[in-house]
Amino acid sequence: MKIDLTGRTAVITGGSRGLGEAMAKALAESGARIALVARDVKRLEVVRDAIRKSGGTAEFFAGDVTREDDVARVAGEVKQRMGAAQILINNAGINIRKNLVDYTLAEFQSVMDASLTSTFLMCRAFVPGMKGTGYGRVINMSSIMGHVSLPGRTAYSSAKTALLGLTRALALELAAEAITVNCISPGPFGTEMNTAVMNNPETNAQFLAAVPAGRWGDVGEVGAMACYLCSEMAGFVTGTDILIDGGWTAR
């Protein structure tokens, strides 16, 4: 069954590259109008132009989603230029790989803010516009690091685990409004965040050995799941977390 998101406006943070870019393109192919949000204007222009070249509709809104004033400004600009948003995908995030005792407070907080605080701010800004419409979709991007962890991921695992709790709580708050709230937790994907691991034969082999499927994930697989969760078919799916990890966490 073809997923049709025609007439829906989707706001995607971290939409300038990686999984955010993949989800933006997938939703655009399904007919959604895409509002890309990130700090890198040059990359935003590239993704916007690629979507338009493929026949989709996309605009970009440069801003720092960890800043309350930037989120308020972006929300106003999206509403003015594209109307109310029915879909919100919170994909922004960073990772600083250090052991706990080596973090500065600023470094730890920056990782938490990029994933968790930004999600709070974006939901607070955009969810009210979904209420009373009979349809709304929020997808928060967690990670398998919210379920398991590795050395040097203290801040990242903390942020991604917290997102699971936020998602469940918000899903309960919004269920009666026909607004679904779910997480996607990707495993190892071939994005820029993992370039160093992939380009090192030793670490690449170690990662692949941990994945029962024996390969890196394709970003299109996350895009497809995002489309499903945004569709009418997923109206009864809320408060849950979808692991896309090639069996990593099933071991």
Predicted regions and their residues:
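C-terminal substrate-recognition "lid" of short-chain dehydrogenase/reductases
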Residues: 120, 135, 179, 215-244, ...
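Substrate-binding pocket helix/loop in short-chain dehydrogenase/reductase
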Residues: 99-100, 107-112, 207
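Residue(s) in the substrate-gating loop at a strand-loop-helix junction
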Residues: 143
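Conserved glycine-rich cofactor-binding loop
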Residues: 9, 16-17
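Active-site helix of classical SDR
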Residues: 123, 159, 167
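The beta1-alpha1 cofactor-binding region of Rossmann-like NAD(H)/NADP(H)-dependent oxidoreductases
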Residues: 41-42, 62-73, 105, 219-220
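Alpha-helical segment proximal to the catalytic Tyr-Lys
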Residues: 128, 172-176, 235
